[in-house]
């Protein structure tokens, strides 16, 4: 059984009935329920298609936050070989919210950075729900500097509601760490590819997403602030998050139209959590194509194209 979102209740009810009938048929050794099960499966598939054909931005935000979506470490495990993680910022501590290291992608050495939310209570606490502290972004800068030194393409996976806003993080220079990570992205003379795999929230996201190629999963979101935060600021009412989500144009489709991202990676019907391997493999295909397209571009051109890309985003919005 999946973890169903509120708007998926019609599908949840039907799939619950299907499971009950299958269990009953197995217990009784009966094949007579096959027609009824097939009928319910068709109704369930049709209901899911109908729901996902007309998703609102707020519903997409909920899918982007789905606890069962594939997370950064799952992408790393499936797409890369010989992954060697690096720990610590050489100043204060190691931040488990931000994963970073080196590995091979289709045999090519690459640098990898990504935000990890965790998949259960224990790992979510370990990874701080994907909200990195200053030491996480300083670790990212370490990886970026080494990627540039050794001329390794950089691949980043973005999945965060935002950088950690706690007092301790502010005391250790959260704003400076985010700004430096963002600036370092702009200096790199290697190909940089960024994938928004779930939430792309605020400076916590952009700090590792200033890339030559930026892609989003079909039901991911990317914005300067969460819908709830925007609603609280604009209307002093966080319950209007649904309105804020629509007004801010946070979806992959909106951002592609605005030329902020370079492409959209399709998800299985029902979201990435219903077909993790297929969506991770599709992401790998996009990364491979992007690396091929930048293979013969010199470092200075890559750097200037990246800077120009983000300057144009600022001018055009």
From Swiss-Prot:
PROSITE patterns: COA_CT_CTER (PS50989). It holds the Pfam family ACCA. Pathway: Lipid metabolism; malonyl-CoA biosynthesis; malonyl-CoA from acetyl-CoA: step 1/1. It is found in: Cytoplasm. InterPro entries: Acetyl_CoA_COase_a_su, ClpP/crotonase-like_dom_sf, COA_CT_C. It catalyses: N(6)-carboxybiotinyl-L-lysyl-[protein] + acetyl-CoA = N(6)-biotinyl-L-lysyl-[protein] + malonyl-CoA. The keyword Cytoplasm applies. Residues 40-293 form the CoA carboxyltransferase C-terminal domain. Keywords: ATP-binding, Cytoplasm, Fatty acid biosynthesis, Fatty acid metabolism, Lipid biosynthesis, Lipid metabolism, Nucleotide-binding, Transferase. GO terms for cellular component: acetyl-CoA carboxylase complex. GO terms for biological process: fatty acid biosynthetic process; malonyl-CoA biosynthetic process. It comes from the Bacteria. One of its GO terms (molecular function) is ATP binding. Its main location: cytoplasm. SUPFAM superfamilies: ClpP/crotonase. It is an enzyme of class 2 (transferase). Its EC number is 2.1.3.15. Belongs to the AccA family. Acetyl-CoA carboxylase is a heterohexamer composed of biotin carboxyl carrier protein (AccB), biotin carboxylase (AccC) and two subunits each of ACCase subunit alpha (AccA) and ACCase subunit beta (AccD). Component of the acetyl coenzyme A carboxylase (ACC) complex. First, biotin carboxylase catalyzes the carboxylation of biotin on its carrier protein (BCCP) and then the CO(2) group is transferred by the carboxyltransferase to acetyl-CoA to form malonyl-CoA. This is Acetyl-coenzyme A carboxylase carboxyl transferase subunit alpha. It comes from Brucella canis (strain ATCC 23365 / NCTC 10854 / RM-666). The gene is accA.
